[in-house]
Amino acid sequence: QTGRGNVLVVNSRIKTVSESPIPTDGIPNVTILDGKGKFLMPGLIDAHWHAYMSCNTMMDLLTADTAYTQFKAGQEARATLLRGFTTIRDAGGPVFGLKRAIDEGILSGPRIYPSGSLISQTGGHGDFRAVYNEPRPFDCCGLTHTEEMGAAIIADGIDAVTVAARNNLRLGASQIKLMTGGGVASLYDRLEDTQFFEEEIHAAVKAAEDAGTYVMVHVYVPRAIQRAIHAGVKSIEHGHLIDEPTMQLIAEKEIWLSMQPFTLGDNQFPTKEQQ
């Protein structure tokens, strides 16, 4: 239902909603916006968004100058706000600086709840290394470009996963993101793969819980979803290939399911001309 009205916002909070004009006498620094011919609606919340990866191509992620990709992320943040999204939960990527710039009023954008670097196993959905890169601990050359910029981090074993989770929390993550299943945009895994041992996932869960927060996981298939739930994960991302028993488990354990449904016509990876 729509109607004509007036809204008073004080310090980013809605104070008054009225069908009649709202007196502003005595309120300093009032800005009046004429909404004639327009609609005012509550701000939308996107529970799964990538400020950085939604606007940068895979080639950008692997090769582009970091400053260039961050400028694109800032532009996308403003566009997201203008689409009506005032709060987003960022599901992975280097957005700590972007969040700070928005919070300090340097850039326009939604409130961001950041996850930080995607945490992936070797050969997992967040492993963007070239085929000639040796796996750790045999790699002689340190972090890859995507790891240095904070897009993803490779962690194998309980200790490495714990460090990766704690480091994201140190940088300001409001939740931790693990890649516990395969995907369609990664180089070395299949969609149906199960990733990370239960003990590794639980290590991230413990680190998150000690910081008063939780773990969200990228995952599609029942086996991988069930493993994540048994490890203590609170939020399942995607889960498109879920079955009935796994859905019942989600309900019993009161797990959040954030599905991001899409169709073949959504064109998730448009060409430059299409963009």
Predicted features along the sequence, with ranges:
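Histidine-rich, glycine-flanked metal-binding segment
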Residues: 2-41
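Divalent metal-coordination and catalytic microenvironments
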Residues: 7, 12, 37, 45-48, ...
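Short amphipathic alpha-helices and their capping/turn segments at secondary-structure boundaries
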Residues: 26-39, 98-106, 160-174, 242-255
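Metal-associated gating/positioning segment near the N- to mid-region
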Residues: 38-104, 122-131, 199, 231
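Active-site mouth loops of central-metabolism enzymes
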Residues: 58-71, 129, 139-163, 214-216
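Active-site core of metal-dependent hydrolases
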Residues: 65-66, 115, 122, 178-275
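Short, acidic/polar
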Residues: 69-79, 156-169, 220-224
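Active-site glycine- and acidic-residue-rich loops that bind
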Residues: 92-94, 150-166, 229, 234-244
